[in-house]
Amino acid sequence: MKYTVESLRQFGIQVAEKAGMSHQDAETLLKNLLFSDMRGVRYHGMTRLSGYVTRIERGCTSATAQPTITMDSGAVFSMDGNNGMGSTIGTAAMQACIRRAKEYGVSFCTVNHASHYGFGGFYAM
């Protein structure tokens, strides 16, 4: 059976929202999963959705956690993911790095206490 990317995106967003994620965070998660699938990296794509939901349901991962900065030296900083979804925490870290790189010329961030962040190439492309 074949599905369109859009139908998978909509389905995945509904599943993630039902698990407790905000619409915006669910969209971020699905962008990451589908980005991976569309590049042939299936083991980091939609196949992971059920596992992510299970971890939320079991209380292993927070569907709503937002990162906090725990160390800040300007261009270099650390974030605590507060046990949140890796895709949303990873996206927040990358966006913060981009903002800081514009200011400092370069930026580096470490993240701890977050779940699997998915397909790494998603953040670089």
Model-assigned labels for residue ranges:
Residues 12, 97, 122-123:
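Aromatic/hydrophobic pocket-lining residues that form π-stacking "cages" and hydrophobic walls in ligand
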Residues 30, 106-125:
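Glycine-rich anion/phosphate-binding loop at the beta-strand->alpha-helix junction
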Residues 17-20, 35-42:
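N-terminal and secondary-structure boundary signal
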Residues 1-19:
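Generic N-terminal amphipathic, Lys/Arg-enriched alpha-helix
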Residues 45-100:
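Active-site cofactor/substrate anionic-group-binding motifs, chiefly glycine-
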Residues 23-34:
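Short, well-structured alpha-helical segments
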Residues 34, 42, 77-80, 107-110:
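Short, conserved beta-strand segments within well-ordered enzyme catalytic domains
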